[in-house]
């Protein structure tokens, strides 16, 4: 490898010598992968937001947090086409400096937002199961909305620095748009990239382990609804690890190489730089997989799809429009299917989707308001009126 070719990878960023690569492999492989993530993520999160906004008949704190998670994922997904175009052009940004800053800010903000709200969902379920009588389980929807706004404020505060400086850098004939680079320095931005993973990871693993242990101690893990709840908890942890761990591991390896080798020979970093951008696609995949979290969060979501599919099939068979039914598909949960399962785990599948639940004469509503009078067998062990 001649010296001239090695120098091609050097780029001065903020008066520091950095290594920057424009890899043909990324240009060929990542755009199709990101395209699939965009399609499935847009469909999944778009449908989730549609259900939240138009078919949810009442709100609870846990659903407010899930709604914010869906918003974060949706905002990240709509930025993917710009990144796809960037990779197709072999890391050559054609939209100018301000759009470059905005897209990188949106990616960083919504990546962090997804992490934060996944963590909040795990903590919320932890308190409802392990500490069912804790005051946090009784927070109002208004309080949950304020907490969500504060979390968004923290997220914006930690990523707004990406809007303040120029991130579009001339690299030969190409314009490179990057917020992460291989430089012999450890910046605050990169430190946060690691901290925002390991701290939530510890919290999510702790909450998941305590919930499963608590249920098994009370010999409740064999109940069908409890098994579904345990599946939900495990899905949250698995999605988090699969999507965010690979890029963090590669970034740590880059820091180690910088500490031991410096930036004198950029060829040392070619493979790890390629690995980092590939693992970043796993990060974007989080927005595609989070709808699985919504699906397992409550029987209401699969019930909704079952109801929608059944109505569509019925109309197709009869060949006539269903004029006697509302064009809005609403779920009416089956209380017989959910009786006896802890509310903290099944998220009240039988009530918020049904308009009758809101009626003053609803028996379900009456029992929920005075559940200490006739608690179900499993609710006695977990505590009632916890959601």
UniProtKB/Swiss-Prot annotation:
Signal peptide start-end: none
Family: Belongs to the G-protein coupled receptor 1 family.
Matching PANTHER family: HYDROXYCARBOXYLIC ACID RECEPTOR 2 (PTHR46048), HYDROXYCARBOXYLIC ACID RECEPTOR 3 (PTHR46048:SF5)
Cytoplasmic-facing ranges: 51-63, 124-142, 210-236, 299-387
Upper lineage: Eukaryota, Metazoa, Chordata, Craniata, Vertebrata
Gene that encodes it: HCAR3
Name assigned to this protein: Hydroxycarboxylic acid receptor 3
Result of altering residue 111 to A: Abrogates completely the activation by OH-octanoid acid
Membrane topology of this protein: Multi-pass membrane protein
Tissue: Expression largely restricted to adipose tissue and spleen.
């Amino acid at each position: 490898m001649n010296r001239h070719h090695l120098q091609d990878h050097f780029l001065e960023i903020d008066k520091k010598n950095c290594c920057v690569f424009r890899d043909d492999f990324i240009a060929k492989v990542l755009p199709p992968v990101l395209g699939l993530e965009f399609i499935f993520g847009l469909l999944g999160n778009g449908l989730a937001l549609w259900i939240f906004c138009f078919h949810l008949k009442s709100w609870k704190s846990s659903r407010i947090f899930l709604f914010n998670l869906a918003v974060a994922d949706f905002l990240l997904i709509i930025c993917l086409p710009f990144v796809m175009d960037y990779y197709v052009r072999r890391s050559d940004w054609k939209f100018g400096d301000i759009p470059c800053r905005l897209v990188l800010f949106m990616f960083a903000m919504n990546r962090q937002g997804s992490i934060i709200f996944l963590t909040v969902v795990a903590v919320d379920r932890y308190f409802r199961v392990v500490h069912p009588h804790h005051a946090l389980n009784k927070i109002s929807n208004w309080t949950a909305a304020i907490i969500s706004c504060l979390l968004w404020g923290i997220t914006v505060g930690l990523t707004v620095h990406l809007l303040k400086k120029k991130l579009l850098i001339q690299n030969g004939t190409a314009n490179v748009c990057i917020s992460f680079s291989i430089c012999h320095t450890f910046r605050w931005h990169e430190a946060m990239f690691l901290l925002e993973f390991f701290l939530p990871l510890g919290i999510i693993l702790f909450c998941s382990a305590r919930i499963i242990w608590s249920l098994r101690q009370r010999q409740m893990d064999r109940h069908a609804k409890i098994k579904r709840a345990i599946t939900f908890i495990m899905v949250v942890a698995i999605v988090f690890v699969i999507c965010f761990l690979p890029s963090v591991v590669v970034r740590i390896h880059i820091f180690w190489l910088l500490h031991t080798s410096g930036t004198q020979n950029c060829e040392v970093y070619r493979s790890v730089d390629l690995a980092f951008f590939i693992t970043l696609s796993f990060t974007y995949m989080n927005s595609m997989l989070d709808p699985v979290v919504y699906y397992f969060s409550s029987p209401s979501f699969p019930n909704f799809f079952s109801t929608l599919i059944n109505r569509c099939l019925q109309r197709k068979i009869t060949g006539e429009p269903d004029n006697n039914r509302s064009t809005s598909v609403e779920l009416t949960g089956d209380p017989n299917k959910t009786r006896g399962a802890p509310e903290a785990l099944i998220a009240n599948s039988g009530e918020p989707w049904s308009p009758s639940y809101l009626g003053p004469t609803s028996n379900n509503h009456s029992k929920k308001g005075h559940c200490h009078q006739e608690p179900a067998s499993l609710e006695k062990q977990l505590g009632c009126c916890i959601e």
